[in-house]
Regions:
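Short acidic, gly/pro-rich beta-turn/loop elements at beta-sheet edges
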Residues: 25-27, 61, 84-85, 150, ...
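DNA polymerase sliding clamps and clamp-related checkpoint/processivity subunits
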Residues: 53, 59-65, 73, 77, ...
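Short low-complexity stretches enriched in small and charged residues
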Residues: 28-32, 65-66, 96, 158-161, ...
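Core segments of cupin and vicinal oxygen chelate
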Residues: 2-9, 16-56, 89, 97-105, ...
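Short, surface-exposed, charge-dense and proline/glycine-enriched linear segments
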Residues: 68-76, 125-134, 154, 193-204, ...
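Conserved short beta-strand elements that form part of the metal-binding/catalytic scaffold
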Residues: 35-68, 113-124, 164-199, 208, ...
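Vicinal oxygen chelate
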Residues: 1-7, 11-20, 50, 63-86, 90-141, 164-182, 217-272, ...
Length: 272
């Protein structure tokens, strides 16, 4: 991972799951991704659980009394106060007062104008977050029914370069780039869903190639995961979208199985 001083603005720098049942959530992700866990305290003295993999920090879990929430992705900023001001200026909402977590930095939750929640983080000097390895975060996609709003907001906030990789009509799938490197994607939600579905970020975690895609999927289902959409090929690897036993959606991905998903008529992997 890049150092704090060189981490590009707009780059994912943390992933956090608020959960109403910390114990069962730990059990599930331990069995599927091999995570271990340790407890820290934030600047207000509240306990905070950090997930590790072979000693490397890969995610955070936070006890939350309330309904099940999605994985929260945090994006790096250079100045949290200035970025929060820009969020409001560009049509978003700041949802809370900033918090400081040792080993991470100052962070705050926002809603973009399309209604999806995401975090901003000004990394601390001792910031540590491992991505791109088996069992860790390797990709994330914003799924929203209001794609133009999302593109404009995040483009203004982070200066993302944006490229449409689908036909833009039947399937609208845009990749966001930082300094020429693809970092995130935005997907238009299926507009024909029978019921309204809120916009959400889908965190993608890499499978262990020594275990394999199919075996990891079976482990997830045996541990209580629900299949949300059958496995599909993509330009970033073979993907399956699941929900954990409490209902939080996430994806497993095998980056070694890359295909051009738009060589044939595409299916919407987020069709609810």
């Amino acid at each position: 991972m890049p150092s704090t001083s060189t981490l590009p603005v707009g780059q994912p720098c943390w992933a956090e799951l608020p959960t109403p049942d910390l114990g069962s959530t730990q059990d599930f992700y331990r069995s599927v991704l091999g995570w271990d866990f340790e407890t820290r305290r934030d600047d207000k003295g509240a306990e905070y659980t950090v997930a590790t993999l072979f000693g490397e920090t890969v995610a955070g879990l936070r006890a939350h009394d309330g309904q099940v929430r999605d994985w929260t992705l945090y994006l790096a900023v250079a100045d949290l106060a200035r970025s929060a001001h820009q969020v409001r200026r560009f049509g978003g909402s700041v949802l809370e007062e900033p918090q400081v977590l040792p080993g991470l930095g100052a962070k705050v939750l926002i809603d973009d104008p399309s209604g999806a929640t995401v975090g901003l983080c000004q990394p601390a000097r001792d910031w540590s977050f491992t991505v791109g390895l088996p069992g860790s975060l390797v990709w994330a996609e914003l799924v929203t029914p209001r794609p133009t709003l999302a593109d404009r907001f995040f483009g203004a906030l982070f200066g993302y370069e944006q490229q449409q990789i689908a036909d833009g009509t039947r399937v609208d799938h845009v990749i966001w780039y930082v300094e020429g490197e693809s970092v995130l994607a935005r997907v238009r939600m299926n507009l024909d869903s029978a019921e309204p579905v809120p916009p959400r970020w889908i965190a993608h975690f890499a499978i262990d190639p020594d275990v394999g895609f199919d075996e990891t999927l079976e482990r997830a289902r045996a541990a209580g995961a629900r299949l949300r959409f059958k496995p599909y090929g993509s330009s970033i690897g073979k993907v399956v979208v699941l929900s954990d036993p409490l209902g939080t959606r996430f994806a497993l991905i095998d980056p070694s199985q890359v295909v051009n998903e738009y060589d044939s008529p595409p299916e919407d992997p987020y069709d609810d």
